[in-house]
Amino acid sequence: MRIVLGVEYAGSAFEGFQSQAHGRTVQDHLEAAIGHIAAHPVRLHCAGRTDAGVHATAQVVHFDTESVRPNSGWVRGVNSRLSSPVVVRWATEAGDGFHARFCAVSRRYRYILHNSPVRPALLAGRVGWFHPPLDEIAMAEAARCLEGWHDFSAFRAAGCQAKSPVKLMHEVRVQRAGDYVVFDFWANAFLHHMVRNLVGALVYVGKGRHSAAWLAEVLAARDRSLAALTFSADGLYLCGVEYAPHWSLPGEGRIIVVPRIPFV
């Protein structure tokens, strides 16, 4: 049978999601915990292979097993074997045709940026930081050019393994909540470092270094060297993965908010 889990984790505790020869990863940590409850080794597949330092409130993973457990048993059992930076939020059984990555129809990322002269202490590693004042209205205006089908080569990491740089950006939103600027990206899929590179470019606009028209020119040029530097991973969250309704998965993703008391 194929079991699907909804997972939340603090990425600052790991060297990314995907298993690697050296370094602590979310996948290795989860596989060890699930394997103990399943009573056999498991191999996980995820919706999004987040980088080192990137967080998730709504990662989706699946694995195959012959072990029979109630959904609540998978949640409680696996969580009992996990350390605090990772938690399983829900579990369900899916058909053999389900795949956490290839069946996903869209994904949502949120970047939370602390825009203040003083760096954050309690939220260090949980939000990005930029001290010069930013114009969120200018950034929101610039972001409109990103919506729709585009070749995002200008915002693609050199080592990106995606077959095509063309993606459908459903929506980009930029809004301020006090000292926080929140960037929301919703697309069918994302390239490696794409969100962090887009945030970097929008920050260039927000601080007045470039106009909104510049971002459209960079997008059209498809040249990575013309864009901004890659922004830090600290404030980036995978906060939603959408699937076709017939899979009947719990919820539609968990969107992290910016509370007055800044804990999540």
Swiss-Prot record:
Domain of life: Bacteria
Catalysis performed (reactions): uridine(38/39/40) in tRNA = pseudouridine(38/39/40) in tRNA
Any one Gene Ontology molecular-function term assigned to this protein's record: RNA binding
A Pfam family reported for this protein in Swiss-Prot or TrEMBL: PseudoU_synth_1
Residues the record marks as active site: D51
Keyword tRNA processing assigned: yes
Protein residues bound to substrate: Y109
Keywords: Isomerase, tRNA processing
Record-listed E.C. numbers: 5.4.99.12
Top EC category: isomerase
Keyword Thylakoid (UniProt): no
Gene Ontology biological process terms, A to Z: tRNA pseudouridine synthesis
InterPro entries to which the protein is assigned, alphabetical: PsdUridine_synth_cat_dom_sf, PsdUridine_synth_TruA, PsdUridine_synth_TruA_a/b_dom, PsdUridine_synth_TruA_C, TruA/RsuA/RluB/E/F_N
Task performed by this protein: Formation of pseudouridine at positions 38, 39 and 40 in the anticodon stem and loop of transfer RNAs.
HAMAP family, per database record: TruA
Family note: Belongs to the tRNA pseudouridine synthase TruA family.
Subunit comment: Homodimer.
Record-given protein name: tRNA pseudouridine synthase A
Species assigned in the record: Aromatoleum aromaticum (strain DSM 19018 / LMG 30748 / EbN1) (Azoarcus sp. (strain EbN1))
Gene name, Swiss-Prot/TrEMBL: truA
